[in-house]
Amino acid sequence: SQNSHARNGDAKNEKIMSFEAGYGYRSRFFTANLNAYYTRWIDKALYDSDTMEYKVDDVNVTDRYTLNMTGANADHWGIELDFIAKPFKWIDVTGMFSWGDWRWNGTATGYYFNSAGQIMTDFKGGIIEDMANAGDYRANIKMDNVHVGGSAQTTAALGVNVRPLKDLRISLDWNFFARNYADYDIDTSNTGLGKEIVIGNPWEIPSYSTFDLSAGYSFDFGKVRATLSGNINNLFNQEYIADARDGANHDWESATRVFYGFGRTYNVRLKFNF
């Protein structure tokens, strides 16, 4: 993540409106929860930051700029389902499904600031000198129906936990992630300060599945009780993209800051209960 200390004097208090409804079912062998939600964020304060390069008297200068924005809105709505089934005493089956539709809406406005906190007039080192003309350099960021990035909007999971012996537990979990969008990008290469910027819908990162295996065994160790357990995460070493920043063409070829997920990982634990 990135941070900025540039002051946003136009920032407003964010407002949140949320509605949620759900239903739960309970029985000896089956438990389930169904939930629906809608949340609206109003006047969210956002920022975008990157580096710029320019020349001053034939000397190369590199600086960082920040675009402070206010007035953006976001709508999140969706459904969630989770359940636990216990068909036999020695087996549990768990599952979940979540589908959401999360989008930015509205027009955010803001100024570009250099690293010194000065309002920029261009990307070549120019700064505003007469605040009476500040409105000429205010950017308007149109964000209608732009998918929120950074988190999968469709997820599912299915797990089986078996206890073949009294002190032995083995679990296998399947996890599915889809409709994860890259974070939106504001392309300054074709943007003039003070003009409207239209944000395109970002690249949809390919969906993927992973499997996790875990096991645990409890036993007596002298006069104390001990448990040996371990996990193998991403059992089949699935390659996948976890996060990215959108590019000019809204596809994998132009995406930047692409982060791949972890491959297969292991851990082993030994616990003593006194």
Positions of the model-derived regions?
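Flexible, solvent-exposed coil segments and beta strand-coil junctions
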Residues: 1-5, 54-64, 127-141, 188-197, ...
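Secondary-structure boundary/capping signal
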Residues: 29-31, 91, 168-169, 223
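Outer-membrane beta-barrel translocator domains and adjoining extracellular loop/strand segments
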Residues: 1-3, 45-51, 100, 105-112, ...
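Conserved C-terminal beta-signal and adjacent last beta-strands/turns
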Residues: 17, 135-137, 145-274
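Outer-membrane beta-barrel signature, preferentially recognizing the C-terminal barrel domain
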Residues: 1-41, 58-86, 148-154, 204-206, ...
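Gram-negative outer-membrane beta-barrel transporters
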Residues: 38-40, 61-186, 271-273
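N-terminal/domain-start segments enriched in small and hydrophobic, helix-friendly residues
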Residues: 28-30, 47, 217
